[in-house]
Amino acid sequence: MDLWSTRSASLELLDSELAEQRRSIETAFKLIDRGIDFFNEHAPNDQYSRICALALAKARNYAHGAYGMILDNLAQEAGALMRPFLEYYELLIYFAKDPSRVSEAAEDRLPKAGKRAELIGSDFKGFREYLNENASHSSYSYHSMRHQIDFESMSIRKTQDFAPEPLFRNLGDLFAQLALLAFQTAISVSVKDFQAGVELSLEAESLRDEGGGHFRLDERLSKTPESSP
């Protein structure tokens, strides 16, 4: 039994045809790491930095886990990790809008995720509901189960084979979310050091434009639901 054959094939593609895409994802992680490093420097004497470092590190962990699952062609299951990723991303927004809110986290009295999303004017309600219905909880919905079924033989797949096109698409989805987190990292840093935040934001903007081109995100966004495959 080879549990890693799909991941190995994905990694081979990332070292060849998708090398630019791999570098874009790695650059996003590097920008996020710089944010964690910044907060670590200030954490000993600053609660905002400690709480933001924790939120950013947790978001990074979930994204890293999702990355590995995507390489295994388990992107649907990786959605279960993107739900808490989104919560930590929105927590960073919540704290940046009012830094005094970090005391709520320190005292374990944060409002519910839905309430926080409402307070920050989150645009991700639909995405959150999709993840809840199809990824974060047990479900027999079409979106949850379709990849498990071999419709030719009507049998249940034990594993997911390597598939280049879904890999490219799913990595693009991950990159888009990492780019959002990189921008929010810059905003969160700017609360403590405006210039450092500006520098990070400029690099995040460059990453968004370059990586977005590598993943053809504009082309994907321009497609209407009727024209999408």
Locate each region found by the language model.
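Internal, conserved structured core segments that host functional sites
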Residues: 81-82, 89
